[in-house]
């Protein structure tokens, strides 16, 4: 974090604030999640949900999606100009699950967007509270990251499916602002840029005229966001080349894919935040907790402590394993989809298994699924320890590159090695070092070749007991150095489809 002077912390991005001191940040983040909690309580009242139904994560997700849709100005405008059959542009809704005679029933509800906006503003002191909306988007994004694989999207843009660990935040909407940009992985940014360049190649007018100028500004802004994630001079210099290109084409796509591959070892800085479902904040507010007064942080002990004391339920399909469903949601809550499983398991206190071994599908239930056979169970979201979330890629020795793995983007600031299969990664870098970026490419490859899988990242950083809120006594775990921990290993998850 070389340029800390110019960066806002991500709590500031999250709350849209300018530079504040730690107490002000904690208060404004507290205000944000408190507003989400108040909104949730009000919605439960409107929908006449029982206490149990209000703690159902599927209901929480429906309510969150309704408010996000109510504030999606661009889409609302589009829907009004292109009326489609059976879609009322002024209404939003979704499935709400209720318990009737010992069975779960699905009820489709519909609300005026205007009404939802009113309830949201009322819960947020009359303000639009965009930060709270972004927070919900990031929670949905983290859930998608833990649930789905993006192989198809990676292949479509010419990237390698093994680069999945770079795809954090790939389902975040465009409108997620600075807080959203901070949590996007290198692969996500590369993919957005490649899509843009491809449109430019296929559509002559993409970069032309008044619209083209706006497109160009967006392109350069995205390039700068990606550049800011890289930690080595050579990677940044290559990003300058991509950004300054007169009319971006295949050469730029090549450079971007090269950079994405290099990020498997020379990892980018990607922020991690524990964003919890709205019902969790609702429960806390309902029990009388004053978030704004107490203060709150997305990257410290607070989310862990909140989850220790919250009981959340989930619908379970007939052949799903409730413990596996819990793991999925736990990972989503802590933005740990791309974390090393050794680290996650240690913090959680129970073994976290790779996704290929999970007997569970996604959290959301499709409208055609049979409710007759649905059961519900408690999600086990507690942890044994807590650890500080990181926004660095865990590169060792003074911001130079260190070992990475085909599948890790660290979430927790905890000492470990980042094992990786150098041969696998380096095989992707054969040949092509000519052209205007040749010296940078050579430099990047040299750094990658000198990286050692046994190097230790986050030297001396440990986890903390849940009673240690000031983080005074770090417990530095020792991991089996040979055993890599990829969540996506032997993957069989469903693809993410909008």
Curated annotation (Swiss-Prot):
GO cellular component: helical viral capsid; host cell; host cell nucleus; ribonucleoprotein complex; viral nucleocapsid
Any Gene Ontology biological process: symbiont entry into host cell
Cellular location(s): Virion; Host nucleus
Gene Ontology molecular function: RNA binding; structural molecule activity
Alphabetized Pfam families for the sequence: Flu_NP
Motif (Unconventional nuclear localization signal): 1-18
Region (Disordered): 1-21
Keyword terms of this UniProt record: Capsid protein, Helical capsid protein, Host nucleus, Host-virus interaction, Ribonucleoprotein, RNA-binding, Viral nucleoprotein, Viral penetration into host nucleus, Virion, Virus entry into host cell
Span(s) of short sequence motif Bipartite nuclear localization signal: 198-216
PTM section of the record: Late in virus-infected cells, may be cleaved from a 56-kDa protein to a 53-kDa protein by a cellular caspase. This cleavage might be a marker for the onset of apoptosis in infected cells or have a specific function in virus host interaction.
HAMAP family per record: INFV_NCAP (MF_04070)
Family: Belongs to the influenza viruses nucleoprotein family.
Known role: Encapsidates the negative strand viral RNA, protecting it from nucleases. The encapsidated genomic RNA is termed the ribonucleoprotein (RNP) and serves as template for transcription and replication. The RNP needs to be localized in the host nucleus to start an infectious cycle, but is too large to diffuse through the nuclear pore complex. NP comprises at least 2 nuclear localization signals that are responsible for the active RNP import into the nucleus through cellular importin alpha/beta pathway.
SUBUNIT field: Homomultimerizes to form the nucleocapsid. May bind host exportin-1/XPO1. Binds to viral genomic RNA. Protein-RNA contacts are mediated by a combination of electrostatic interactions between positively charged residues and the phosphate backbone and planar interactions between aromatic side chains and bases.
Protein's name according to its UniProt entry: Nucleoprotein
Natural source organism: Influenza A virus (strain A/Parrot/Ulster/1973 H7N1)
